[in-house]
Amino acid sequence: MHWKSSQSPRKKKARMSKSEFKAMMIVFFDIRGVIYIDWVPEGQTVNQVYYKNVLTTLRERVRRRRPDMWKNVSWILHHDNAPEHNALSVKRYLAKNNIPVMEHPPYSPDLAPCDFFLFPKIKSALKGTRFESMDAVKAKATQLLNSLTQDDLQHCFQQWKIRMERCRDREGGTTLKGITFRLSDFFQ
């Protein structure tokens, strides 16, 4: 055993310096894989105008990558309660384009698949890696996203279902356009 006084200097620990690269992405995915990744340019604020442009691109990607869902209008958008998602112009855009939205309870990151599954998975895979450029960060993150298996995504959506049902059972019911629904209707 080694004794130290309260005046002894602290033991030095090696710490990794913070990265000089900060990347923000907006990701849309379903049980079959990633549909669209938008890399937000450095210095860009994600406001309602920017988000509407993202949604326009998303619609095109759904049409091309999920034609069966596009034809049947069987895809539902789930996003959290960020101000740009709830802006009147965004809500009008969604209504005009017949994009159904699954409401998200306020202040509930535990109910957002990106927050409890996707971003932690990517962050832990990138932790400790040094990148030479922003393009290298984007390439690695995109590769990680595209390498998610259907089992990974199935697990994510099963966890989401469990979390949402727990919320509903605790009187935090979920509605879509004023109609209460069972979450099992959306999961296979």
Where are these regions (language model features)?
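Surface/interface recognition patches
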Residues: M1-Q188
